[in-house]
A protein has these predicted regions:
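Extended intrinsically disordered or low-complexity segments
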Residues: 3-340
């Protein structure tokens, strides 16, 4: 297969990705990825090492089912900007049992209450919460939010799980005998805390969601007998491109961020508050040259903003796509240029 010539005129990482759209038409997706370093005083600079586009994604751990630390960066498009926070809750003083963690990027904001370890415990007097342990650095993962699955009621044919976060904790697992216990979530919505045993609350998180989780999975369309008969292997006619947005509920912007928005993170570093602005960078422009046809100019959209407070990195992704009827063989040149 002939590979297109790549001309990257930006200081950022760039990757052309060849996939298919909903109707199995070959498309080229141009993904531009910028990495910036920031310090705790809010100074931002372009990183010496630009992180490459991550086609496979990266889980938080190597257990068979883990939440994504970084999603695979191969979406066809996103209809709005995803905002993702990667890091740990950091209590401002020793001995604290709760800290409120937050992020704000332009119009997008979210706050969570983060607690030290605690459990539901079965005793002769009933099921009660244990004492809350002093907070240490708590990873802001979906594993530490409300959710999980109930192994006692699951079968090989059917898993009983919290559909919005099957990797979390606090869901299911009946407590029936003395000493039985169930870990409560560390991360909760401060407006909807877990009040009593058996309560079901919205999982609260800051990370990437997985395609099979709700509400994201509801946008994947209807896979029924009619689809099987008349449309398979294409995606269902009611597939909704909102499926491609992978940020947590509350962290999808109303449209695309433009750059220069203010960013504030709370209680996720040794400094309780860190603030800076997104770089005032215009979206890069891509030009795709198709064999025997006119060039296609592709303006990109800033569709993913990742703030990693562990590494003190800001990652921005811009994306665009174009039909390429012959797949990679149809594309002779891909250029990307920075715009002022």
């Amino acid at each position: 297969v002939a590979h297109p010539e790549i001309d990257n005129g930006t200081p950022f990482a760039f990757e052309p990705v060849f996939i298919a759209d909903e109707d199995l038409r070959p498309v080229i997706v141009t993904v531009v990825k910028a990495t910036y370093d920031f310090d705790l005083q809010g100074a931002l600079q372009l990183a010496d090492e630009q992180i490459p586009v991550n086609l496979a994604g990266e889980p938080w751990s190597d257990v068979p089912v883990s939440s994504y630390k970084y999603e695979p960066e191969i979406a066809l498009c996103k209809l709005a900007t995803d905002v993702v926070l990667i890091g740990h809750a950091c209590p401002p003083q020793a001995g604290a049992t709760r800290v409120d963690v937050g992020i704000k990027v332009g119009p997008v904001r979210k706050v969570a209450a983060v607690f030290g370890e605690r459990f539901w415990v079965f005793t002769k007097g009933g099921i009660a919460k244990s004492r809350t342990a002093a907070l240490e650095r708590i990873p802001l993962t979906w594993e530490n939010a409300f959710g999980g699955h109930d192994k006692s009621r699951s079968t090989p044919e059917r898993t009983v799980a919290e559909p919005r976060n099957p990797v979390g904790t606090g869901f299911g697992k009946p407590l029936a005998k003395d000493g039985d216990h169930l870990r409560l979530p560390n991360i909760e919505d401060p407006k909807q805390l877990v009040g009593q045993y058996g309560a079901v609350v919205p999982p609260c998180g800051f990370g990437f969601t997985s395609p099979n989780w709700q509400p994201r999975a509801s946008f994947a369309g209807t896979y029924d007998a009619q689809w099987n008969k008349s449309r398979k292997p294409l995606l269902p006619a009611d597939f909704d491109r909102r499926f491609f947005n992978a940020a947590a509920p509350g962290l999808i912007a109303p449209g695309y961020l433009q750059g220069n928005e203010d960013v504030v993170v709370l209680n996720v570093t040794s400094m309780p508050r860190v603030a800076f602005r997104l770089p005032a960078v215009s979206p890069p422009r891509c030009r795709v040259v198709l064999r025997g046809r006119q060039d296609t100019e592709l303006p990109t959209n800033l569709d993913t903003v990742i703030v990693n407070t562990d590494e003190q990195q800001l990652i921005l992704l811009w994306r665009a796509y174009a039909l390429a009827a012959g797949g990679p063989h149809d594309v002779t040149t891909v250029e990307v240029v920075a715009t002022s």
